[in-house]
Swiss-Prot record:
SUPFAM superfamilies: HMG-box
Organism in which the protein naturally occurs: Danio rerio
Keywords: DNA-binding, Nucleus, Repressor, Transcription, Transcription regulation
Record-linked SMART domains: HMG
Protein name (database record): Transcription factor Sox-21-B
Pfam families, A to Z: HMG_box, SOXp
């Protein structure tokens, strides 16, 4: 490598002229003090000086500047800035799997996996829709995957249910007091001892001598699909009429 040209230093200003002797003195008095702390203290002391106390150093700085201009008439201040590392921003706001086209649920129309992946990577909206479709095929049965909105069409299902059929189940999946009481009276010989998970501490089981759980009280698992830009939905008690769908 070629040797760089001799660097021409900037002329000292009034503070640099004053702090040259003060820095040496403070460093001798505090040998363990860091240079940055010394500069901080010198700057605070320089601000406390009056204009008459600063005048000799200001005049000396002007003389040094005039001498510098004579010695280097073509001088121009060019600060040597450190190169900044360019941060690579993510192209997409959400991660897209590289092997998205290899999934059986995403193979459409006989397209090769590479072409499908490139088309999804070029269009984030299609990638999000494809990811949601794959998740629906995993969590739900094929009939619901073909028409995912049928699961949420509760208005049409409500008309099929008669008012007496609404047996409000417990949000925790336990049998209600009326169901347990009727089961105990109607079939007292069929009661058996079992245990429930504790609502306050899931690690413990609570023994119970109530009747067996009715089929209406069992709740199917509910899965949430989180897409980009959507927050986690608040969990609400699963209603009894939705469990009958």
């Amino acid at each position: 490598m070629s040797k760089p040209m001799d660097h021409v230093k900037r002329p000292m200003n009034a503070f640099m002229v004053w702090s040259r002797a003060q820095r040496r003195k403070m460093a001798q008095e505090n040998p363990k003090m860091h240079n940055s702390e010394i500069s901080k203290r010198l700057g605070a002391e320089w601000k406390l000086l009056t204009e008459s106390e600063k005048r000799p150093f200001i005049d000396e700085a002007k003389r040094l500047r005039a001498m510098h201009m004579k010695e280097h008439p073509d001088y121009k201040y060019r600060p040597r800035r450190k190169p900044k590392t360019l941060m690579k921003k993510d192209k997409f706001a959400f991660p897209v799997a590289y092997n998205l086209g290899e999934h059986e649920a995403l193979k459409v129309g006989g397209l090769p996996a590479g072409a499908l992946t490139e088309s999804l990577m070029s269009n984030p909206d299609k990638a999000a829709a494809a990811a949601a479709a794959a998740a629906a095929r995993v969590f739900f049965n094929p009939s619901m995957s073909a028409n995912p909105y049928s699961f949420f069409d509760l208005g049409s299902k409500m008309t099929e249910l008669s008012p007496p059929s609404f047996s409000y189940a417990s949000p925790l999946g336990y049998p209600t007091a009326a169901t347990a009481f009727s089961g105990a009276v109607g079939g007292g010989a069929h009661t058996h001892t079992h245990s429930h998970p504790s609502p306050g501490n899931p690690g413990y089981m609570i023994p119970c001598n109530c009747a067996a759980w009715p089929s209406a009280g069992l709740q199917p698992p509910l899965a949430y699909i989180l897409l980009p830009g959507m927050g986690k939905p608040q969990l609400e008690p699963y209603p009894a009429y939705a469990a009958a769908l």
